[in-house]
From Swiss-Prot:
Residues 18-34, 64-80 have a biased composition (Basic and acidic residues). Residues 1-98 are annotated as: Disordered. This is Transcription elongation factor A protein-like 1. It comes from Lagothrix lagotricha. Residues 37-54 have a biased composition (Acidic residues). May be involved in transcriptional regulation. Modulates various viral and cellular promoters in a promoter context-dependent manner. Does not bind DNA directly. Belongs to the TFS-II family. TFA subfamily. GO terms for cellular component: nucleus. It is found in: Nucleus.
Length: 159
């Protein structure tokens, strides 16, 4: 009776040997090359941040990067924490959600974009004057288009 017990005890000892060999053969997924990991991180960031939303999130992302690592929010948390916008982004930016006339918004945005307009630094008065000129040109163009349309259709026969 002692011999079968000893044989039964030997079999379980041989089984762990095969189990010990298996982990050495398998490759853990943590041993990926750093290039693969960085490309995966980039693709996840691209999926999470559509390009048209990046300009709006940039100030918040920069603020979170200035904080110490323990206080820093991850980019995904930063994106999810934003309140939903009233209107979807339309490529123009968030100015459609702001109040005020075009000239007022232009004067308010000046400090952000100083020197961006063809390398010139304009005063608020110069910017407002340029906006007035643009609005005047739009009005004249619309008047000319209306006059042309009326002249075209006032004839008894088509041109």
């Amino acid at each position: 009776m002692d011999k079968p017990r000893q044989e039964n005890e030997e079999e379980p000892q041989s089984a762990p040997k095969t189990n010990e060999e298996r982990p050495s053969v398998e490759h853990s997924p943590e041993k990926q090359s750093p290039e693969e990991q960085s490309s995966e991180e980039q693709s996840s960031e691209e999926e999470f941040f559509p390009e048209e939303l990046l300009p709006e999130l940039l100030p918040e992302m920069l603020l979170s990067e200035e904080r110490p690592p323990q206080e820093r929010l991850s980019r995904k948390d930063l994106f999810e924490g934003r309140p939903p916008m009233e209107q979807p982004p339309c490529g123009v930016g968030k100015h459609k959600l702001e109040e005020g006339s075009f000239k007022e918004r232009l004067a308010r945005s000046r400090p952000q974009f100083r020197g961006d307009i063809h390398g010139r630094n304009l005063t608020n008065e110069e910017m407002i004057q340029a906006a007035d000129e643009l609005e005047e040109m739009k009005r004249v163009r619309n008047k000319l288009m209306i006059m042309h349309w009326k002249a075209k259709r006032s004839r008894p026969y088509p041109i």
